[in-house]
Amino acid sequence: ACLVGSEMCIRDSNCYCEFVGKKEPIEVGADICVGSLIKNLGGGIASNGAYIVGRSDLIHLCSERLNVAGEAKEVGPSLGANKMFLQGLYFAPSVVASALKTNVYAAYLLEDLGYEVSPKWNEEKSDIVLAIKFNDRNKLIKFVEGIQSASAIDASCVPIPTKMPGYDDEIIMASGSFTQGSSIEISCDGPLRSPYIAYLQGGLTFEYGKIAVLKAIENIK
């Protein structure tokens, strides 16, 4: 929640969640909702950008803050990005469906192998993220390395645990994506601390996601 003047507003960060459920936050009470276009809503096509949706008066305030006071959404360059934004939005439902299929597939296989996963393959999803508990430092590292080795870009690179700003522990991350930082393509990361949980998300196509999951599982056997 946040204050706008003297009014309390409900603000939601919707990253990883778009098109997963039947309703979006603004349909169930949120006043304003924000998210990234290099995640679900960009459909793997948008290479940058973010979005804001919600009450028109709040959108107006945001546009004045982000652009120019008094001009709001009436002016401002698009820098030729509108095509990829709209094309990404067009493909987003299908891409998110593929990411969810990858999530279910990975959850089923890993649970069958004895690993604790959340959510389980047959549980309702609220986002595209799958948490996998390894209880083993080396297996976490090997799983993330497996995802990287099946990535479309930089498959030959080997992720190395390292310190990152904002974290107390070393982080290992696989993200061999066409767009740097994109998590809808296929990515996996986790902190190097007990119980050694990896967070898997994405899959532009189920076929692509399936190969990455199988490669990662093969790497921890």
Predicted regions and their residues:
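Conserved active-site segment immediately N-terminal to the catalytic lysine
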Residues: 25-40
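Short, solvent-exposed amphipathic alpha-helical segments in soluble enzyme
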Residues: 26-27, 51, 67-68, 145-151
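Single conserved hydrophobic/aromatic residue that forms the stacking wall/gate
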Residues: 1-5, 9-10
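Conserved C-terminal alpha-helix-loop-beta "cap" of PLP-dependent enzymes
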Residues: 111-220
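Catalytic cores of alpha/beta
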Residues: 19-25
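General beta-strand structural signal in soluble alpha/beta enzymes
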Residues: 11-14, 33-36, 119, 155-159
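Fold-independent oxyanion-binding glycine-rich loops
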Residues: 12-15, 36-38, 55-56, 189-190, ...
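Active-site C-terminal subdomain of aminotransferase-like
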Residues: 38-139, 212, 216-220
